[in-house]
Amino acid sequence: DPEELTSHSYKPLGSGFFGLMGNRLPVSFLDLARAHPFTGTGLHLQMQEAPCDYRHGNRFEGGAPAAKA
Protein backbone atom coordinates (compact mmCIF):
# COMPACT_ATOMS: atom_id res chain seq x y z
CA ASP A 1 0.00 0.00 0.00
CA PRO A 2 1.68 3.28 -1.11
CA GLU A 3 -0.05 5.29 1.63
CA GLU A 4 1.44 3.02 4.28
CA LEU A 5 4.92 3.41 2.81
CA THR A 6 4.72 7.22 2.75
CA SER A 7 2.82 7.97 5.96
CA HIS A 8 5.91 8.00 8.17
CA SER A 9 7.75 11.04 9.41
CA TYR A 10 11.51 11.37 9.39
CA LYS A 11 13.72 12.99 12.00
CA PRO A 12 17.13 14.46 11.14
CA LEU A 13 19.96 12.64 12.87
CA GLY A 14 23.31 14.16 13.85
CA SER A 15 24.99 12.83 10.71
CA GLY A 16 22.54 14.65 8.46
CA PHE A 17 20.73 11.49 7.42
CA PHE A 18 17.09 10.88 8.18
CA GLY A 19 15.82 8.04 10.33
CA LEU A 20 12.38 6.48 10.26
CA MET A 21 10.57 7.63 13.40
CA GLY A 22 7.01 6.42 12.86
CA ASN A 23 3.91 8.52 12.20
CA ARG A 24 4.57 11.75 14.15
CA LEU A 25 3.71 14.56 11.74
CA PRO A 26 0.16 15.70 11.00
CA VAL A 27 0.82 15.52 7.23
CA SER A 28 1.87 12.48 5.23
CA PHE A 29 4.59 12.60 2.61
CA LEU A 30 2.06 11.46 0.02
CA ASP A 31 -0.16 14.47 0.85
CA LEU A 32 2.88 16.73 0.64
CA ALA A 33 3.87 15.29 -2.74
CA ARG A 34 0.33 15.68 -4.08
CA ALA A 35 0.22 19.31 -2.92
CA HIS A 36 3.54 20.08 -4.67
CA PRO A 37 3.74 17.95 -7.83
CA PHE A 38 6.92 17.87 -9.88
CA THR A 39 6.32 19.66 -13.18
CA GLY A 40 9.83 19.75 -14.63
CA THR A 41 11.65 17.43 -16.97
CA GLY A 42 14.96 17.00 -15.12
CA LEU A 43 15.87 15.43 -11.84
CA HIS A 44 14.96 17.20 -8.61
CA LEU A 45 18.60 17.17 -7.53
CA GLN A 46 20.22 17.51 -10.94
CA MET A 47 23.92 16.72 -11.25
CA GLN A 48 26.02 19.66 -12.37
CA GLU A 49 28.01 19.43 -15.58
CA ALA A 50 31.16 21.07 -14.23
CA PRO A 51 33.24 19.15 -11.70
CA CYS A 52 33.89 20.50 -8.22
CA ASP A 53 36.38 23.37 -8.16
CA TYR A 54 38.55 22.53 -5.17
CA ARG A 55 40.98 25.38 -5.85
CA HIS A 56 38.41 28.22 -5.84
CA GLY A 57 35.67 26.59 -3.78
CA ASN A 58 32.06 25.88 -4.60
CA ARG A 59 29.03 27.80 -3.40
CA PHE A 60 25.52 26.43 -3.60
CA GLU A 61 23.34 29.47 -4.24
CA GLY A 62 19.94 27.80 -4.49
CA GLY A 63 19.45 28.56 -8.18
CA ALA A 64 20.04 32.32 -7.83
CA PRO A 65 23.44 33.99 -7.71
CA ALA A 66 24.39 35.41 -4.34
CA ALA A 67 25.06 39.14 -4.06
CA LYS A 68 28.72 40.05 -4.46
CA ALA A 69 30.28 41.12 -1.16
Curated annotation (Swiss-Prot):
It comes from the Bacteria. This is ATP synthase subunits region ORF 1. It comes from Fuscovulum blasticum (Rhodobacter blasticus). The lineage of its organism: Bacteria, Pseudomonadati, Pseudomonadota, Alphaproteobacteria, Rhodobacterales.
